[in-house]
Amino acid sequence: MHLLIPAAGSGKRMGAAVNKLLLPLLGQPILAWTLQAADRASSIEWIGILSQPGDWPAIEQILAAMDLSTPVQLLQGGATRQESVYRGVEYLYNLGTVERVLIHDGARCLATPKLFDRCSAALQQVDGLIAGIPVKDTIKVTETGPKGIQIQSTPERSRLWAAQTPQGFRLSLLWQAHREALAQGWQVTDDAALFEKLGWPVYIVEGEESNLKLTTPWDLVLAEQILQQRLELAR
């Protein structure tokens, strides 16, 4: 399975002056933890990192220190996650040999090899899927008015799932979806939303509670605790 990792974001919400994936987490950069999990997944045969050229020297240092068994290629990312994935999908499509692809946020460094393998196996049966977990909290749909944020409705919680990554798709369809998005001016926050706009089915594979997306400094604290616990259990 080919894996694309969007890694071109900034560290603004993390309060960092550099790409947050280069920040240290329990002894190594965040991106290194993500790569380590993907490398240990038996189904992953190639990894493409979508990043800005300015970050390539730092990423190359990370790769040199890790000695991964899976081939890794640096690809230029875009100004947004959507543009980065578009470029990665275009690259793979032009190869003419790739049928399916997984996409995984670089900031989800706690995903396990088992999750990558589970998504890869499920993708052999469907054209689109995402990792996800059932929502535990009651969710409110709101609208901001003159007096503040007002609740408009409460969706039925039993039907709500929190989207994670990896997300996987048949490559030819994902390329078609991204080209349509470019033509129509669609802006989405994940690739599954493009399939939804086109009326194509996307299925859910059970994700992991610990598969956090590191966005704020508090997320770093939680991630360090989770990784520390895993290391202690592995001793």
Swiss-Prot record:
Entries under Pfam families matching the protein: IspD
PROSITE patterns: ISPD
InterPro entries assigned: IspD (IPR001228), IspD/TarI (IPR034683), IspD/TarI_cytidylyltransf_bact (IPR050088), ISPD_synthase_CS (IPR018294), Nucleotide-diphossugar_trans (IPR029044)
GO biological process, any: isopentenyl diphosphate biosynthetic process, methylerythritol 4-phosphate pathway
CDD domains assigned to the protein according to its UniProt record, in alphabetical order: CDP-ME_synthetase
Molecular function as annotated in GO: 2-C-methyl-D-erythritol 4-phosphate cytidylyltransferase activity
Catalytic reaction list: 2-C-methyl-D-erythritol 4-phosphate + CTP + H(+) = 4-CDP-2-C-methyl-D-erythritol + diphosphate
Keyword list, A-Z: Isoprene biosynthesis, Nucleotidyltransferase, Transferase
Pathway participation: Isoprenoid biosynthesis; isopentenyl diphosphate biosynthesis via DXP pathway; isopentenyl diphosphate from 1-deoxy-D-xylulose 5-phosphate: step 2/6
EC number(s) stated in the UniProt entry for this protein: 2.7.7.60
Sites annotated Transition state stabilizer: R13, K20
Residues annotated as site: Positions MEP for the nucleophilic attack: R157, K213
The family this protein is said to belong to: Belongs to the IspD/TarI cytidylyltransferase family. IspD subfamily.
Function: Catalyzes the formation of 4-diphosphocytidyl-2-C-methyl-D-erythritol from CTP and 2-C-methyl-D-erythritol 4-phosphate (MEP).
NCBIfam families in the cross-refs: ispD
Protein name: 2-C-methyl-D-erythritol 4-phosphate cytidylyltransferase
Gene: ispD
